[in-house]
């Protein structure tokens, strides 16, 4: 399947469908070089305010990331949205982008990045450090997963 990479209203470059894509279709594999999390961390500091948190890193598991700046394809330009039309499927350290619903020709492909971060961050921190520009109706304001809230303890008789 050929995809079109062009300017996006969300941020920078985006990937657009050049034809209709049916729900459930595997659209593209996210390719690049497998690197350790330590190597990925050395490439970017979480709290560097001068950086727009723009990387081509995709965490595959607890050990490795795919660095799409090295041997990556069009998938590295797929933007985030809090209302995605695509989802990620990880199989044996390979990452595939699948259509969550039918996608029309010319529509931008987007998935929820759902960044995992330090649990000490508040939503205000996440919105400041990882701001979202998707403008979806239900936008949570950040590319990151919301912090987990402790469950209230239930008193049992």
Predicted regions, residues:
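C-terminal SET catalytic tail plus cysteine-rich post-SET Zn-binding segment of SAM-dependent SET-domain
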Residues: 81-157
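Catalytic cores of histone-lysine modification enzymes
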Residues: 1-89, 152-153
């Amino acid at each position: 399947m050929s995809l079109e990479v062009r300017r996006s209203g969300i941020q920078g470059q985006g990937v657009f469908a050049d034809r209709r894509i049916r729900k459930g279709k595997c659209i593209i594999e996210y390719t690049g070089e497998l690197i350790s999390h330590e190597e990925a961390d050395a490439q970017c500091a979480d709290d560097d305010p001068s950086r727009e948190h723009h990387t081509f890193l995709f965490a595959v598991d607890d050990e490795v990331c795919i660095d799409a700046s090295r041997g990556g394809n069009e998938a590295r330009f797929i933007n985030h949205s809090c209302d995605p039309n695509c989802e990620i499927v990880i199989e044996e350290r390979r990452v595939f982008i699948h259509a969550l619903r039918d996608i029309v020709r010319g529509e931008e492909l987007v998935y929820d990045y759902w960044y995992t971060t330090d649990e000490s961050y508040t939503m205000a921190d996440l919105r400041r450090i990882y701001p979202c520009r998707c403008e979806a109706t239900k936008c949570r304001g950040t590319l990151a997963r919301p912090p987990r809230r402790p469950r209230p303890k239930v008193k049992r008789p």
